[in-house]
C-alpha cells in the first residue's frame, strides 16, 4: 500500500481531497526531508464528516449489530496489525523520529488493545436484569449498554497510532462511529490504519478521517451539537479550550493532558540501578512522552554521585536515524518544537540552573549525520528549584531538572514532588519498601 499521491481525507465512505485543495507537507524529523503532502481539511470538510457520521449512526445497523460481529472485526484488525507490523513501524518511525524498536513496541501494544477490547466488549453482550427489594416482581428492570453515538478522537503527535487505538478500539467495539483527527505533524500511521480498517471489513461509514490542524477545524468538531463525545490527548491549554467548548452542548468529554513528573530517589538506592532508571525515564523518545520522569528529586547525600552518573550516561546516548538499529534515541519532532526546548534551556540558565551536559544541538562537525535533522542533545540542568519555569512547565523534551532534598527529609521530597499543576505520573526509588510506599501514597498526581 502506498500513501504518496493519494487523498488523505476519508469522508462519507470516500477518500477525497480538501474542499479548497489545500495541502501541507509532513517531514521526516531525522533529516527534515518532505515525506509526502497530506490534504488539509477545511471547516466545511469537518461539517460534512459530522453529518456523514451522524447519518450513518442513525440509519445503519452498525450500532445494532451483535457484539460478536463487531468484536470479530476487532480481532481481524489485530491480525492485520501484526501482518503489517514492519511497514507500520517504519511509517511511524519516519514520521515521528522515534526508534524502530519503540515503534514496533507500539504496534504490539495496539494489537493487544484490539484483542483486549474484542474480549471485554463481549461481556456487555447481554443486558443485566436488576433485582432487589425496590423492584417489584411485576417490573422488569434492565441495565442496558448503548453506544454514545458520534465520537471525535483527537490524537497527539508523539504516539499517533498508540493513542488512536486506545480510543478507537473501545469506541468501535461498542457500536459508536468515529471522526478521527490526528495531529497534523504526524498523521501518516493514522492514514495507513484507516486503509487497513476498511480492508478488514469495518463499514466505511463507521469512520471519518480528517487530516488538518486543530486551529482550522477543532472548534467545528468540539462545538457541534451532532457530536456526542470528544476524546482528546494533548496540551493543557488546548484541553482547557476543548472542555469549555464541550460544556456548551453538554457533550461527553475525556482528556489526557500534560505532565511534569517527579522521580524521587532516596540515598539507599543502588547507584547503578538508579542511574539507569533516571536516564531511561527522562530521555526515552527524546523526552517527548507525557509520563517521562523530567524532575529528579534526589536525597542530598546521593545527589552528586547520581547526577554525575546520569550526566556520563546521557553523554553516551547514541542519537541517529530511528531506522538505524544502533540509534538509542532520535530527533525532536519538528523545528518548532526544538526551538521551544532551546528557549526553555536559555530561560533555565537565566533563572540560575547549571547545564551539566547538553543544552545545545549536536556539533555538526562531530556529528555531520545529525546536522539536517531536529536533534537536541540530552540535557541535565542542576541546581534547580521549584520556582523555575523549567521545573514547573512541561518542556516535553530531553531535559532533566535536578532538585535536592535534605537527608531523611521525606516531607520535603513529597512537597517538592507535589508542587506542580500537572502531576500525571511519578516515581519513588528506595530499597526500603515501607518508605517507598509511604512516599508514593502521599503523591498527589491529578
Named regions from a protein language model:
Residues 1-38, 72-76, 108, 123-154, ...:
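Terminal low-complexity tails and localization/encapsulation signals of metabolic enzymes
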Residues 33-36, 227, 318, 368-370, ...:
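Conserved C-terminal structural/oligomerization subdomain of aldehyde/semialdehyde dehydrogenase
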Residues 45, 216-217, 412:
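Short acidic active-site motifs
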Amino acid at each position: 500500500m502506498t500513501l504518496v499521491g493519494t487523498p488523505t481525507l476519508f469522508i462519507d465512505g470516500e477518500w477525497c481531497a480538501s474542499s479548497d485543495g489545500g495541502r501541507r507537507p509532513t517531514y521526516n524529523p531525522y533529516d527534515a526531508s518532505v515525506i509526502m503532502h497530506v490534504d488539509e481539511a477545511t471547516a466545511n470538510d469537518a461539517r460534512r464528516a459530522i453529518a456523514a457520521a451522524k447519518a450513518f449512526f442513525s440509519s445503519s445497523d452498525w450500532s445494532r449489530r451483535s457484539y460478536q460481529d463487531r468484536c470479530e472485526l476487532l480481532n481481524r484488525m489485530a491480525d492485520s496489525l501484526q501482518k503489517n507490523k514492519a511497514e507500520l513501524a517504519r511509517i511511524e518511525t519516519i514520521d515521528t523520529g522515534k526508534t524502530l524498536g519503540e515503534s514496533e513496541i507500539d504496534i504490539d501494544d495496539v494489537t493487544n488493545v484490539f484483542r483486549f477490547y474484542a474480549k471485554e466488549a463481549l461481556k456487555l453482550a447481554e443486558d443485566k436484569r436488576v433485582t432487589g427489594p425496590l423492584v417489584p416482581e411485576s417490573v422488569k428492570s434492565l441495565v442496558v449498554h448503548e453506544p454514545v453515538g458520534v465520537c471525535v478522537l483527537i490524537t497527539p503527535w508523539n504516539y499517533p497510532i498508540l493513542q488512536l487505538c486506545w480510543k478507537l478500539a473501545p469506541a468501535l467495539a461498542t457500536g459508536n462511529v468515529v471522526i478521527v483527527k490526528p495531529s497534523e505533524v504526524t498523521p501518516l500511521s493514522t492514514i495507513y490504519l484507516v486503509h487497513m480498517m476498511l480492508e478488514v471489513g469495518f463499514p466505511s461509514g463507521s469512520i471519518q478521517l480528517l487530516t488538518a490542524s486543530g486551529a482550522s477545524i477543532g472548534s467545528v468538531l468540539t462545538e457541534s451539537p451532532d457530536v456526542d463525545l470528544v476524546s482528546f490527548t494533548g496540551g493543557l491549554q488546548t484541553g482547557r479550550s476543548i472542555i469549555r467548548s464541550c460544556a456548551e452542548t453538554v457533550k461527553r468529554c475525556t482528556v489526557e493532558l500534560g505532565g511534569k513528573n517527579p522521580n524521587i530517589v532516596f540515598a539507599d538506592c543502588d547507584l547503578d540501578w538508579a542511574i539507569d532508571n533516571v536516564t531511561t525515564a527522562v530521555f526515552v523518545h527524546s523526552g517527548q512522552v507525557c509520563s517521562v520522569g523530567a524532575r529528579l528529586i534526589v536525597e542530598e547525600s546521593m545527589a552528586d554521585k547520581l547526577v554525575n552518573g546520569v550526566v556520563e550516561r546521557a553523554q553516551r546516548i547514541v542519537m541517529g536515524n530511528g531506522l538505524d538499529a544502533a540509534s538509542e534515541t532520535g530527533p525532536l519532532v519538528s523545528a518548532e518544537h526544538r526551538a521551544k526546548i532551546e528557549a526553555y534551556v536559555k530561560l533555565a540558565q537565566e533563572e540560575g540552573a547549571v547545564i551539566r551536559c547538553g543544552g545545545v544541538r549536536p556539533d555538526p562537525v562531530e556529528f555531520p549525520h545529525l546536522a539536517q535533522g531536529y536533534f537536541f542533545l540530552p540535557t541535565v540542568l542542576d541546581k534547580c528549584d521549584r520556582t523555575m519555569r523549567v521545573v514547573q512547565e512541561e518542556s516535553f523534551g530531553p531535559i532533566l531538572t535536578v532538585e535536592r532534598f535534605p537527608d531523611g527529609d521525606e516531607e520535603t521530597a513529597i512537597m517538592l514532588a507535589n508542587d506542580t499543576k500537572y502531576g500525571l505520573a511519578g516515581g519513588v526509588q528506595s530499597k526500603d519498601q515501607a518508605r517507598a510506599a509511604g512516599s508514593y501514597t502521599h503523591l498527589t498526581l491529578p
